[in-house]
Amino acid sequence: MKKTASLIQYIYLLFLAVITACGDAFFRGDSNGTAALAAKILIYCFLFYAFFLLAEKALASLQEPAERHGWYQVFQYNWKNVLRISLLLFAVYFAYLLVFYPGATTGDTVYQIEDLFTGTSPIAYPVNYGHTKVQALMIDHHPVTTTLIFTFFYRIGLLLGDANIGLFLYNLLQSACMSILFASIVCYMDSLGIPKPIALISTVFYASPVVASYAVTMGKDMLFSFWFVLYYLVFFQIATNPNDEGSEKKQWVLLAVLSVLIALMNKKGMYLALLSNLCLLLVVPGKMKINAVVTALLPVFILAVVMQQILFPLLNIMPGGKQEVLGTAFQQTALSLIEHPEKYTEGEKQLFFTILDCSPEELAEVYSPTCTDPVKNRFRLETDNSVILSYLKMWARHFICEPGTYIRAIFSVNGGYYAPLKGFNVYQYVPYSEVLNAFSQPDRTASLRITLGAFLAWLENIPAFSVFCQDSFYTFWYPAFSLYLFCKKKQRKKIILLAPLAGNLLFLTIGPLCYTRYALCQIYTFPVLLAVTAGAVQEKKEE
């Protein structure tokens, strides 16, 4: 039995090493051949083995009796401690907000506000429609719910005489809400019997520069991540206490509401809720399985039927383009055509270039190995669904024939979510919009902004510590360790807790760009996963 378990463990390590080595080689753009890739696989096998061993020992060392230190009482689960830690975190976030006043935002956010505010919206993507305007309330290129929220605060700023005030108020409110949420998570660990050092580590983590930077940044991914954490906590409650009477009522209602909210904040939220809630069928008993199905399908009904079929036509909202869904497929086909044009018939080439506003001669110049946007933004909006279906059949045929090329196209973009190559990206500035006559940051704090940015860059380059400043640690390495630990400790029911995280990793893998904000929901939930794995070690010791 032990030999079988060891064999499975080694196969698992090899599997992780192969994925990570591919992510490493292709994300770097290495072309050193099979031998170099094999060497990386062996190195990553050793690194994963060492990481699993060290992580388990580190968690075991934290199993310390609470009475040894009086300061452990700070993390006991009561409203006073939640308030204290909330104020501490808010003080950190508020300091960041003052330095980066009125806070940071993204180019996408500015476009969203321009979209709704002007009423005559430019079609930002694809490129060949860059000068086309449509008479619409807004475009669903970005989630309309977040567009409404961001524009609401922009208008508040205008009413108060300065658009910067609206951005500041939004980031102030977001910082306060995140402070309360994160403090509640830290103190909630006490009710789970988690070792108190985990609560301390989590508090320091939530006060870290990367979390503070995103707490004062207006953007759809930040807003989605906030609601995702709440969703994950309720998902955690139901998955770990499937027979609890409370979960049969209040928890299921909360899960349904939060499933809809994460879908409204980010389109991938609909698919995450669908897949994750259906996974609850594996752990919940009897009639509760109906609840799991309902909560899974509700976001699909709201977004695909109520919004797309009823509200959008009624309110004159233009649906988003299909290129967002097809971007990864376009990227794979583009790379395959560039490297192996002889494998495509003239009819297949004509089909692909009918969908994209791009000639075969231009493709190599348009293609970017690290981002899908340049290729997908050439999509012709008027393309018929039957043409897209024909293309997908062609894509599937070539995927089977050229899996290596297609996989390389994916990892060239998003290998940084698997291999420890990419540090955190944060937003510390605001893009100015001539259309909105906003936003801007004062010159008097420029030196402080530069100093904090340099400090974060310095942290990311400290040996050993830099491991915790990598996207891949939160998106792949620690979840992979968690799966290993749950299986080793025979706590397989906890594997279900990885479903939302695995779903998000899937979307990261086929995403348009390797950027921290897309992985933010997994970074925010890391302390929860840390607590669960610490609890797994503790429960085993008590058996």
Language model region names:
Residues 12-25, 44-49, 78-106, 300-312:
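Transmembrane signal-anchor helices characteristic of membrane glycosylation enzymes that use polyprenol
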Residues 99-106, 120-177:
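Membrane-proximal lumenal/periplasmic loop motifs of glycosylation machinery
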Residues 316-445:
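Membrane-proximal stem/loop segments at transmembrane-domain junctions that anchor or position
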